[in-house]
Regions:
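N-terminal Rossmann NAD(P)H-binding glycine-rich loop of SDR-like oxidoreductase domains
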Residues: 4-23
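NAD(P)-cofactor binding segment of oxidoreductase domains
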Residues: 65, 76-104
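Active-site Tyr-X1-5-Lys
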Residues: 115, 128-154, 180
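Conserved Rossmann-fold NAD(P)-dependent oxidoreductase catalytic core, especially the SDR/UDP-sugar
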Residues: 91-132
Length: 291
């Protein structure tokens, strides 16, 4: 039985990973919050990855670290962003060395590439981070590979993770809620922006595959199909038998962005293919809005 530490375990992705891995592994979860908020039964330790002394006191040895902890913000001048996503990465790498960790799985962000210029998007797509947040995620990739060695690090570049715990102000829960309540959709531009959504349960499955294969390297972890905003709205309307209408207004500065993602490398080296359809995920999210 492997001993696996998950940072940011209370988050959207971290909690899904813990839920899947619990049955076959000893899971230790850590997050900044005082209490375990996942509803799952595992050893939970409150810890802040920016505090190296506290981090070094976590259990040792550890077989695998799944690093989910991160600050997500559009504030390019946020000190917390740098402290968590950069200094926190260095501290986590130091702990990994001291804990004799065999492999570290880092959840990165596919949008570090900036505007997609080559589709489908592969792992060799040029990198052009559009914000400081995305710069910190790319820093995380490079720093971990440098500090631990490329053969010990698995990087997952993820597009748009979704699940039942997705924040209610995000586009997918908003669309689902609108459809259920027969509220009209207001979409910027012509709704042509194409996005890739992946269920957090599939991300957890990808983590499990990487652990089993004892892999290393950079992998796009995405679903098989991408959808425009217009297609997503139409899908919600049809799925929930809604009378909602679609209205178009304003400008979408990313109207021509196409997040069409190649997962060939993950299929070939990890044996991973996304299982959950967008319809299944939308139905799962809808449970938040149905009495």
């Amino acid at each position: 039985m492997r001993k696996i530490l998950i940072t940011g375990v209370n988050g959207l992705i971290g909690s899904a990973i813990a839920e899947l891995l619990l049955s076959k592994n000893e899971v230790i979860g850590t997050s900044i919050e005082k209490n375990n908020q996942t509803g799952l039964d595992f050893q939970y330790i409150q810890s802040n990855i920016t505090d190296n002394k506290t981090l070094q006191n976590l259990p040792k040895p550890i077989d695998i670290i799944v690093h989910c902890a991160a600050i997500i913000t559009g504030d390019d001048f946020s000190n917390a962003l740098i402290n968590t996503n950069c200094i926190g990465i260095q501290n986590t790498a130091s702990y990994a060395i001291n804990a004799n960790c065999k492999n570290l799985i880092f959840l990165s962000s596919l949008p570090i590439i900036g505007k997609p210029s080559i589709v489908p998007i592969t792992e060799t797509h040029p990198i052009n981070p559009p914000t400081i947040y995305h710069i910190t995620k790319y820093f995380g990739e490079l720093a971990l590979q440098n500090l631990l060695g490329k053969d010990r690090v698995i990087v997952f570049r993820i597009p748009s993770p979704i699940g039942r715990k997705t924040a209610p102000n995000k586009i997918v829960p908003v669309f689902v809620k609108n459809a259920i309540e027969n509220i009209d959709f207001n979409i910027l531009g012509q709704g042509k922006r194409i996005q890739n959504y992946i269920d957090v349960r599939d991300i957890a499955r990808a983590v499990e595959c990487a652990i089993e294969q004892e892999s290393s390297g950079i992998f796009n972890i995405a679903s098989e199909h991408s959808y425009s905003n217009k297609e997503l709205a139409e899908l919600c309307i049809n799925l929930f038998n809604s009378s909602s209408k679609i209205n178009y207004a304003g400008e979408d500065k990313e109207e021509d962005f196409q997040w069409i993602v190649s997962t060939d490398k993950a299929k070939r080296e990890l044996g991973f293919t996304a299982k959950y359809s967008i319809e299944e995920t939308l139905m799962d999210i809808s449970k938040n809005f149905k009495k």
